[in-house]
Swiss-Prot record:
Protein name in UniProt: Octanoyltransferase
Annotated ranges, domain BPL/LPL catalytic: 30-209
Enzyme class: transferase
HAMAP family, A to Z: LipB
Subcellular location: Cytoplasm
Organism name: Rickettsia typhi (strain ATCC VR-144 / Wilmington)
Lineage top rank: taxon: Bacteria
The protein's role, per its UniProt record: Catalyzes the transfer of endogenously produced octanoic acid from octanoyl-acyl-carrier-protein onto the lipoyl domains of lipoate-dependent enzymes. Lipoyl-ACP can also act as a substrate although octanoyl-ACP is likely to be the physiological substrate.
GO biological process annotation, one example: protein modification process
Coiled coil: none
Positions annotated to bind substrate: 69-76, 143-145, 156-158
Length: 209
């Protein structure tokens, strides 16, 4: 079973990024076991490799970090569970297929949300997990941005639990001007982070065996 490591307190993004990159190197060079980091970041905007500078609107005093993950701008902060699976897609029980890996991440998060009575949706040409908030209108509850090096995965998924959604006003989230964001709290689901973590670990082990 893959080990989950919960990093306590609010984590600086760059500190966490170095932690991830160092562990990826250990997996590549020393065959270290797969792990999953569970993180809650201090406030930060991060940009993926497909970002456009005009999508950064008004970041104020929140730091902006340009990363190597896929995707565009997003926000990380308190009340958001960020999950960084470091998996080896070259193992015999895995597949060297990035699209399949992302599909498995999507299935994992949708199944986890379903536990709380929330139906998650996938929208064509829009990465992430979406919630139907009104007729024909969807809001994003989880962002996905990954990177792979020598078939070792890092970066991952960010799920809004009790996130201050106003912070997303400083960017065009994921480059989608008309997109809304939501959280478990906004949907009327109030859950402690450790309780949410139990569910995502259970659902993870059903998909990533």
């Amino acid at each position: 079973m893959i080990k989950f490591i919960t990093l306590q307190n609010l984590m600086d993004y760059q500190v966490t990024l170095k932690l991830m990159e160092d562990y990826v190197n250990k997996v590549i060079n020393y065959n270290e076991p797969e792990i999953v980091y569970l993180v809650e970041h201090s406030e930060v905007y991060t940009a993926g490799t497909n970002y456009k500078q005009e999508e950064l609107l008004n970041y104020g005093d929140i730091p902006v970090i340009y990363t190597g993950r896929g995707g565009k701008f997003t926000f990380h902060g308190p009340g958001q569970r960020v999950i960084y699976p470091i998996l080896n897609l070259a193992l015999p029980n895995r597949h060297k297929d990035l699209k399949l890996y992302i599909k498995m991440l999507e299935e994992w998060i949708i199944n986890s949300l379903n536990y709380f009575g929330i139906k998650g949706y996938l929208i064509k040409d829009k990465v992430g997990i979406w919630i139907k908030v009104s007729k024909g209108e969807f809001a994003k509850i989880a962002a996905i941005g990954v990177r792979v090096r020598k078939w070792i995965t890092y970066h991952g998924v960010a799920i809004n639990i009790s996130t201050d959604l106003c912070k997303f006003n400083g960017i065009i989230p994921c480059g989608l001007e008309s997109s809304l964001v939501t959280s478990l709290n906004q949907l009327g689901i109030y859950v402690e982070m450790f309780e949410f973590d139990k569910i995502i670990q259970t659902e993870f082990n059903k998909i990533f065996k």
